[in-house]
Amino acid sequence: MIRKEIVLPAARDEVWAALTDPRQLEEWFANDVELDLRPGGEARFSWGNGESRTAIVTEVEPEERLAFEWDEEGEVEFTLDDDVEGTRLTVVETSPAWTTALALQASALALA
């Protein structure tokens, strides 16, 4: 699991739009975005290097919480909270690949 929090100097509705509006996502995340913003909806992301990924939207609580399931590779959850400086965005990504990668790193460090 990876967890990251950042306080953004923007109102919650602006941060929500940056996470859910395909045109805004294309400005900072992927070159091409299609998003059916409802539980069970599909999200498709494509990048300029030819890579693409598909996710299924699992949770939508407008301006509060958004969650995706990446194929069968894991989940990512975005949570928005008010902060005196704007909006706190918390991103949590869980994936079996992270568990394996971190275990391998721990083993390598133990051997060093």
Annotate each language-model stretch with its function.
Residues 94-112:
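A conserved amphipathic terminal alpha-helix motif
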Residues 25, 35, 67, 108-111:
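Generic macromolecular interface patches on structured domains
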Residues 20-21, 30, 62, 107-111:
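Residues at helix-coil transition
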Residues 1-34:
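Hydrophobic ligand-binding cavity/cleft-lining segments
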Residues 1-13, 77, 82-92, 106-107:
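Aromatic-glycine hotspot motif
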Residues 34-39, 44-96:
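Hydrophobic-ligand binding "helix-grip"
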Residues 16-19, 28-29, 70, 97-102:
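Tryptophan-centric aromatic hotspots in well-structured domains and transmembrane helices
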